[in-house]
Amino acid sequence: MSREITARPNKNVPIVVGVCVVAFFVLLAFMQQKHKTHSGGDYGVPTFSNGGKYRDGTRSADFNSNNHRAYGCGGSGGSVSSRVGQQLVVLAIVSVLIVSLLQRLRSPPEHICNGACG
């Protein structure tokens, strides 16, 4: 009568996947490129991300404003807390999908009795 020992399912895979997903969203949150706030270009004066005026004793510049919702100025949903909330919701959805997928893929270990099981 031969006996086979089945391998235990690897319980570290969901933990590793979860840590990778969290690290990815943290990377996205902190690595967003910022717009340029100062320039040494033609004017040699600070530039403004959404328009504005600059005036000192020798120079003045008027930068045209872009869209009123640009860079979260005056638009809803542009604050940091709302972006973090949205990222947490997406993180939760992705985590649930990954966990459910891993549970579906994990099959119960096969028990081979070779006719000796009672």
Swiss-Prot record:
Membrane topology: Multi-pass membrane protein
Keywords from the named record: Host cell junction, Host endoplasmic reticulum, Host membrane, Membrane, Transmembrane, Transmembrane helix, Transport, Viral movement protein
GO biological process, one term: transport of virus in host, cell to cell
GO CC annotation terms, alphabetical: host cell endoplasmic reticulum membrane; host cell plasmodesma; membrane
Residues that span the membrane, as ranges: 12-32, 82-102
Cross-referenced InterPro entries: Plant_vir_prot (IPR001896)
Compartment list: Host cell junction, Host plasmodesma; Host endoplasmic reticulum membrane
Subunit structure: Interacts with movement protein TGB3.
Function according to Swiss-Prot or TrEMBL: Participates in the transport of viral RNA to the plasmodesmata. Is probably targeted to plasmodesmata by TGBp3, along with viral RNAs-TGBp1 (RNP complex). Can gate plasmodesmata and increase their size exclusion limit.
Family listed: Belongs to the virgaviridae/benyvirus TGB2 movement protein family.
Designated name of the protein: Movement protein TGB2
